[in-house]
């Protein structure tokens, strides 16, 4: 499980935008159709109020319709639903198509009159028969959604087209919309873009919004993300929440416009305050992570909650993460995290399904249930979560929740790799190299591991090195003699693993080069290999000896002492402690330091190092770096002699005979 929260990356937001543009997230809904009122007669809309009232009072039905409309929306006059209903009724009773349309709209909205969709649809039909474009458009919306009449999207499309051809911008929008979604008529993005362009040119924000989708996705028109951003800006100025949301996503991700997190946050806020759940979630992200807005975790979590209450699966997932980790001011609560992840998963959130799978697999917040974990991973994979294939592969490989099935494991790792998941590439490459679920394919496996590393999965190189090292060791152990051809392959395996950073492989390559195993002797190259493996105690000792004895390099006792001391201090190696003590005692690689020399000799002697016991015995005999003590000298020399040290035995014999000793 993650140790900390991370914001959605820009690339993920582009994906979120594409998903939003193909969902109902940015659709305005039915009522917005009745906000698109279309063109009124230029004559009537241009009359001043006094002239209009005089004509209406004189019984002019068209003037009555216009006056009704102005009273209904408060245009140039105080808004008065009652006056609107009175004038619209008078106009409609006079047989005026415009009056019938306006009265129908009032009945539909319940403005000044009880809401009555059936009567509204009847009046729209009367107006439509007289060729009134608003009546046609509004009747089309009723037919589209089955409000006040039987739903008939095909008939709605025909009415929208007829009204659009008469110049109705509102009808152009609706017809373009039906063409875009293929509702009641064959989907045709090209026709959709053409009709939406007519409506957008007349300033209809909803048309600008949908046309922007066409431009952004290249549907029915050439892809032009900059042009899409321009249209969303126009629609956002008109206050369209979905346009604010889409524009915010583009600004956040720098798609079609220069990235501007502060501006993005502003548009998310505008859309969020209009009730758009996706915008609430992203505004929460901005506050939680301080992206384009002041960092305010409490405010961010509050927006997450509001978004979750409105059904945002992303917000539910993020709140689950907060509770699982006990961050963002929320108590650690595995049960609440599971509840939120379940809610998100029910809406198709694939990563939430993975989290639930993890919980059941490892018993975090719920009873461990491997088969159920497997089912959740499978669900996540079916919803497009490429990483889920890795977890499925692990379960099948190790028999978690199912019998062991290396072939199925390999198939899932391959699916993850083909989907571009770096972890999947690494696991697939490992299986190819190790022959899991298939015969070993070393070249293909190595190539896949390198591809995984290039894609950002750094552990892939470690796996490559491990696989090569293991094979190299097997070949080395299986070799029958010095001429075995497997030795050359072993050397190559060690070389590849060493280049990938495997220290033990670098050491083994050095050993092969030093002894001519599977390769000609090259002490200088061996030294460079030991240097790569210098974190290992054996490599430190090899380096020290190479420099001390001048094997393949110029003799350098300073460097030799350095590596002896490194091995002695870091690994407490008896030979290293003896060698460091010897050099310090005799002034090799550093000025003589008998006390320090005796210190290291004593440490090595206590570990049973015979050479150190011999040198320590001599030091005690002569008082070199320590007080003179025949008892201690005899003790250490006897220990060395028992360990097979000939010099110690000879010295003890001479002591016994009383001969002169140096």
Where are these regions (language model features)?
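TPR/TPR-like (Sel1-like) alpha-helical repeat modules
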Residues: 443-457, 530, 534-535, 628-646, ...
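Hydrophobic face of amphipathic alpha-helices that form TPR/SEL1-like repeat modules
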Residues: 35-36, 66-73, 102-109, 136-145, ...
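Helix-turn-helix repeat elements of alpha-solenoid scaffolds
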Residues: 39-46, 80-81, 116-117, 152-153, ...
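Terminal, low-structured helical/coil segments at or just beyond the last alpha-helical repeat
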Residues: 8, 642, 646-662
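Short helix-capping/linker turns of helical repeat alpha-solenoids
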Residues: 29, 57-60, 73-75, 80, ...
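Structural recognition of alpha-solenoid helical scaffolds
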Residues: 9-12, 29, 44-51, 464, ...
């Amino acid at each position: 499980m993650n140790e900390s929260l991370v914001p959605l990356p820009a690339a993920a937001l582009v994906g979120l935008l594409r998903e939003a543009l193909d969902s109902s997230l940015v659709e305005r809904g039915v009522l917005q159709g009745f906000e698109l009122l279309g063109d009124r007669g230029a004559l009537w809309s241009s009359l001043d109020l006094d002239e209009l009232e005089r004509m209406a009072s004189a019984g002019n039905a068209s003037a009555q319709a216009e006056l009704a409309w102005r009273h209904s929306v408060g245009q140039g006059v105080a808004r008065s639903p009652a006056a609107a209903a009175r004038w619209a009724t008078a106009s409609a009773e006079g047989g005026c198509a415009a009056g019938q349309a306006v009265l129908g709209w009032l009945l539909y909205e319940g403005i000044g009159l009880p809401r009555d969709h059936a009567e509204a649809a009847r009046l729209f039909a009367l107006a439509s028969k007289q060729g009134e474009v608003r009546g046609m458009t509004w009747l089309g919306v009723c037919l589209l959604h089955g409000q006040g009449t039987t739903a008939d999207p095909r008939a709605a499309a025909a009415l929208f087209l007829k009204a659009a051809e008469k110049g109705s911008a509102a009808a152009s929008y609706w017809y373009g919309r039906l063409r875009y979604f293929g509702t009641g008529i064959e989907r045709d993005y090209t026709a959709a873009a053409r009709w939406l362009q007519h409506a957008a040119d007349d300033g209809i924000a909803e048309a600008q919004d949908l046309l922007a989708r066409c431009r952004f996705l290249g549907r029915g028109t050439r892809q032009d993300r900059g042009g899409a951003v321009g249209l969303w800006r126009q629609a956002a100025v008109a206050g369209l929440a979905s346009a604010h949301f889409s524009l915010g996503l583009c600004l956040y991700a720098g798609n079609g416009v220069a990235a501007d997190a502060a501006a993005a946050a502003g548009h998310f806020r505008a859309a969020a305050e209009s009730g758009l759940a996706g915008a609430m979630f992203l505004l929460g992200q901005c506050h939680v992570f301080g992206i384009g807005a002041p960092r305010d975790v409490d405010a961010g979590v509050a927006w997450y909650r509001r978004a979750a209450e409105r059904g945002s699966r992303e917000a539910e997932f993020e709140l689950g993460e907060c509770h699982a980790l006990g961050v963002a001011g929320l108590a650690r609560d595995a049960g609440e995290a599971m509840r939120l992840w379940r809610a998100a998963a029910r809406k198709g959130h694939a990563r939430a399904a993975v989290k639930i799978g993890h919980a059941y697999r490892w018993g975090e917040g719920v009873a461990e249930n491997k088969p159920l974990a497997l089912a959740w991973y499978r669900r996540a994979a079916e919803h497009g979560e490429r990483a889920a294939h890795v977890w499925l592969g692990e379960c099948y490989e190790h028999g978690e929740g199912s019998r062991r099935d290396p072939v199925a494991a390999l198939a899932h790792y391959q699916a993850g790799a083909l989907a571009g998941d770096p972890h999947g590439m690494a696991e697939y490459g490992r299986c190819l190299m190790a022959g899991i679920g298939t015969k070993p394919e070393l070249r293909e496996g190595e190539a896949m591991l390198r591809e995984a590393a290039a894609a950002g999965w750094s552990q892939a190189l470690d796996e490559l090195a491990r696989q090569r090292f293991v094979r190299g060791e097997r070949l080395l152990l299986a070799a029958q003699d010095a001429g075995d051809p497997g030795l050359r392959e072993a050397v190559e395996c060690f070389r590849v693993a060493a280049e990938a950073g495997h220290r033990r492989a670098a050491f083994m390559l050095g050993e092969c080069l030093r002894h001519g195993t599977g390769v000609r002797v090259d002490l200088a190259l061996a030294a460079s290999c030991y240097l790569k493996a210098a974190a290992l105690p054996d490599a430190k000792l090899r380096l020290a000896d190479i420099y001390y004895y001048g094997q393949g390099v110029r003799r350098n006792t300073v460097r030799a002492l350095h590596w002896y001391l490194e091995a002695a201090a870091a690994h407490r190696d008896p030979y290293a402690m003896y060698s460091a003590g010897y050099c310090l005692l005799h002034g090799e690689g550093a000025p003589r330091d008998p006390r320090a020399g005796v210190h290291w000799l004593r440490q090595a002697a206590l570990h049973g190092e015979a050479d150190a016991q011999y040198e320590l015995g001599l030091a005690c005999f002569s008082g070199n770096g320590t007080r003179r003590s025949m008892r201690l000298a005899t003790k250490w020399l006897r220990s060395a002699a028992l360990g097979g040290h000939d010099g110690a035995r000879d010295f003890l014999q001479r002591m016994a005979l009383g001969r002169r000793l140096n």
